[in-house]
Design a protein with these regions (language model features):
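N-terminal membrane-proximal hinge/A-helix region immediately C-terminal to the signal-anchor transmembrane segment
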Residues: 1-96, 111, 115-123, 158-159, ...
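Cytochrome P450 I-helix active-site segment
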Residues: 6-13, 114, 118, 166-170, ...
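Cytochrome P450 catalytic-core helices
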Residues: 263-288, 397-414
């Protein structure tokens, strides 16, 4: 039997700094690591992490959440905002929370959520005008956070939705920098830290107010908040079936806002960029939406026929998924032929996996048609935009549906044209966003207001 050994240290580590200088070009550094081994150690100052570069070992990490629990700097910063929500809680709390939250994302709820998404996207797009230059990420962020806010609570006043949008952007701008700021420097009262603290407090206060309104009114308003407040499961050997507390409900909602809005906004922005820069794909997309949709507003019932749109979203998520996510070992263990101590930060990268030439031929190129020939079972093994295993994103269907519906609506109404000062280079964080994506709107149809879509 082969003896387990420690992961190899990535080359270029400097005294005290570790790989901090190499990480000034983070994606280049990340993509250099597989050449050095299946597990590679990275250091930044006093921080240590092991990056998993092998697909099979990545799946072992994701499937065994008891040993490879949620943890690391990404999760530490996430917990500052989202507390002990489903996306940030430890293994010991996860099963109970998952059982309680799951009904809110049952497939029979999706038609209602779809109508909410389409209505919110229509309101944003109805304000656009031909020839206008938009910041695509800002606009898609507005669509996404408004959609989540409306899906969460039918009782949310419009002014509160606007404040949620502002607070979301404030938190998103600072969060990645805080992930890489070691203690005690993360507690210094810098202007960014003060903005972060104020936005975090306002967001949590808004969610508490929404909960209070729901507690006082009718128990089921048909929204996600109602489902969480009413959720209860039968007692089992591992939990007593208690409802979610108000604090737990608040943590879930804040998690949905932060994780869901960011992922959807960035995916839609990258999709718009990729469609605009690939004319043959744009032509196929326009032909599909013109054929499938009776108006410029898609319906839930159109989804199964929007295959080109769906494949564009899939391919976008392949090229621009999460860059680096973390787990922490709860005990000493072995991963493949490597030994890991308890408390080791383990980094896995959907970005690395999705650009592996042995898994995806011609991996650097945008080819939505590749998904016509990839069996679903094969995709599940190598395609991880929403992770995998027990901690797979609970909102994967919700988020993918929103991306598909909004992209279809965008393509039906507008053609987007990049402008000169646009910069589509990816900015590294837990996820990847375009640096500056400005595009000119060219109308394909009239821009008059569309009626709200029904959930049919």
């Amino acid at each position: 039997m082969e003896t387990a050994h420690a992961p190899v240290l990535a080359p270029g580590a400097l005294p005290l700094l570790g790989h901090a200088l190499a990480l000034s070009a983070p994606l280049r550094f990340l993509r250099s690591l597989p050449a050095h081994g299946d597990l590679v150690e990275v250091r930044v100052g006093p921080l240590r992490a092991v990056v998993v570069c092998d697909p099979a070992l990545t799946h072992q990490v994701l499937l065994n959440d008891r040993v490879f629990d949620k943890g690391g700097l990404v999760l530490k910063r996430g917990r500052e905002i989202a507390g002990n929500g489903l996306g940030t809680c430890a293994h010991r709390d996860h099963r109970r929370q998952r059982r309680l939250v799951q009904p809110a994302f049952h497939r029979h709820r999706m038609p209602h959520y779809a109508s909410v998404m389409v209505r919110q996207a229509s309101e944003v797009m109805n304000a656009w005008r031909p020839g206008q230059i938009i910041d695509v990420l800002d606009e898609m962020g507005t669509v996404s956070i408004r959609s989540i806010a409306a899906a969460v609570s039918a009782a949310l006043p419009p002014g509160r939705a606007d404040s949620l949008i502002a607070d979301y952007f404030s938190l998103e701008q600072v969060l990645y920098r805080r992930m890489l700021t070691p203690p005690p420097f993360d507690r210094l009262p810098t202007p960014g830290k003060r903005r972060y603290d104020r936005a975090r407090a306002r967001l949590q206060q808004t969610v508490q107010e929404i909960i209070a309104v729901h507690r006082e009114g009718k128990p089921d308003r048909g929204d996600l908040m109602s489902m969480l407040l009413l959720a209860r499961v039968a007692p089992s050997d591992t939990d007593d079936g208690r409802r979610l507390s108000d604090r737990e409900v608040s943590d879930q909602i804040v998690s949905f806002f932060l994780a869901g809005a960011k992922t959807v906004a960035e995916t839609l922005s990258w999709s718009a960029h990729l469609v605009a820069t690939h004319p043959e794909v744009r032509q196929r997309l326009h032909a599909e939406v013109d054929t499938v949709m009776s108006a410029s507003v898609p319906l839930y019932g159109d989804l199964h026929r929007l295959k080109t749109t769906e494949n564009i979203v899939k391919e976008t998520l392949r090229l621009y998924p999460a860059a680096a996510l973390t787990r922490t070992t709860t005990t000493a263990t072995e991963l493949g032929r490597y030994r890991l101590r308890a408390g080791t930060t383990v980094v896995y990268s959907p970005y690395l996996l999705h650009r592996h030439p042995g898994l995806f031929p011609d991996p650097e190129h945008f080819r939505p048609e590749r998904w016509l020939s990839i069996p679903a079972a094969d995709a599940r093994a190598v395609y991880l935009p929403f992770a995998a295993g027990p901690r797979k994103c609970i909102g994967d269907t919700f988020g993918f549906m929103e991306c598909t519906l909004v992209l279809a609506m965008l393509a039906a109404r507008w053609q987007l044209e990049p402008v000169g000062d646009s910069d589509s280079s990816p900015v590294f964080g837990a996820t990847l966003r375009p640096r500056r994506l400005r595009m000119r709107l060219i109308a394909r149809t009239g821009t008059e207001d569309e009626p709200p879509a029904s959930p049919a």
